[in-house]
From Swiss-Prot:
It is a multi-pass membrane protein. The chain crosses the membrane at residues 15-35, 56-76, 86-106, 131-151, 175-195, 254-274, 298-318, 348-368. InterPro entries: L-PG_synthase/AglD (IPR022791). Its main location: membrane. GO terms for cellular component: plasma membrane. It is found in: Cell membrane. The lineage of its organism: Bacteria, Bacillati, Mycoplasmatota, Mycoplasmoidales, Mycoplasmoidaceae. This is Uncharacterized protein MG306 homolog. Keywords: Cell membrane, Membrane, Transmembrane, Transmembrane helix.
Amino acid sequence: MSTPKSASFFTRKNILAFSFFIAFLVVVSVLVTVFFLDIKTGDVKTIINTINRTNWPWILLIVLGIVVTLAWNIIINWWVARRFCFHAPWWEWVLFACVVQFFQIVTPLSLGQDPFRLYWFIKKGMKKQTAVLLVTSTGAFWNLAQALITWPSFFVLSQNYALLEQNHEGFVSYWFSFAGMIFDVVVAILFIFIAYSKRMHVLIYSGVNQFRKWIKRPYLTKEQIYQRFIDKAEFNKLYGLEIKRLGLTIFKLLANILIAVVGYFSVFAVFAIVKKENATNNVIDQYSTADIFNITNIAITASNFIPVPSGEGATQFVMTSFLNAFKSAVGIESQVKQGVFLWRFLSVYIPAILFSLCFIGWVVQVVIEFKHPKPVLPTVNLINHHFWNNKKLHN
C-alpha cells in the first residue's frame, strides 16, 4: 500500500533540501582538507608533476578498487533481492550502486549507505521486513572484513612496540589506532545486535517514533510497536537462517576482504606513482611492501578515531609516525603528504564528484516518480513464504 503524498516525508522540497545539504557537506569536507593540509593550487600541480610516468599503470589498481566496489554493490544486492522476487531494470541497479557508493564516501564511517539501501528497496515495493533482513544480513561484513585484515597487521606492528614507545608520535598513534580498531569491532557487533535483538528493536522504534511525533509525522502507537516485537521473533529465525547460508555468508566475507585488500594496497600504488628517480628517500625503497601494507591499513582504520580533521590528516599523521618509528628517513613526510593526498584525490574526491552526478540523477528520478507514480511489483511476503515452506516440510 503506497503512502499518501501528504504523509510522505520524501517530498520534492525535502529531497531538494537534502541534496543541497549533501552538496554543502562535500564542499565543506574538501575545504577543510585543503586548508588543514595547507594544500594550494601550486601544491596540486607539483604533486601532478612529480608523478613517475613509468609507474602510471599503478593508477589502474586504484581504478580497479572503485570498479570492484561498484560491482559488489550491484551483484550482492541483486543476488539476494532476486530470491524475494524483487526485480529492477539493469540501469536502475547501476544507478543504485553509484548512489550507494556516493553515500559510502560522503557520510562518516559510511553510515549513510544502509539507510539509503533500505529506503530504495522499500520504495521499489519490497516489504519492510524483507528489506531490513536484506540490508542487515549484508551490512556487518565490511566491518568484520576490516577486523580480519587489520588486527593481524596490528599484531605484527606490536612486535615493534619498543620502537614505537621511544617515538612520542608513534606511541600516540599506536594507542589511537588500537582505539579505532576496537571502535570498528564495536560497530560490527552493534550492527548484528541491533538486527537480532528484539529489545533493541523496540527501543530503536520507540526513539524513532518519538522523533516522528515531535516533527508531527505519522508514528506507531505502543501497541503497534509491541506487535512488531512479536513479529521480531519470527524475523530472528529468518535472520539466523540467512546467516547460516554458509556459501552466501562466506562469499560476502571474502568479497569484502578482497575489496579492503585492494583499497589498502592502492596506497602502495600511489607511493610507486610519486616515486622519485635517482632518490634514496622514496617510501617504497625505504620500507618493505609488507610494512607499507600493514601500516596503511592500520592508519586508515585509525582515522576513525584520531582527533584530526579530515581523513588525509589522520592517515598522514599515523603513517608518518609509524614509518619514522620503524626507520627515521629524511624527507618522507613530504612524500607521505603527497601520496596520501593523491590517493584520496583518485579514490575519494574524483569518485565523489562522479557519483554525485548519479545522486542528482536519482533525485530527479524520485521527483519524476513522485509526480507520476507507477505501480510497483510486490515481492514475496517473507514471513508467510518461509512459514509456508516450513509447514509443508513438517507435514
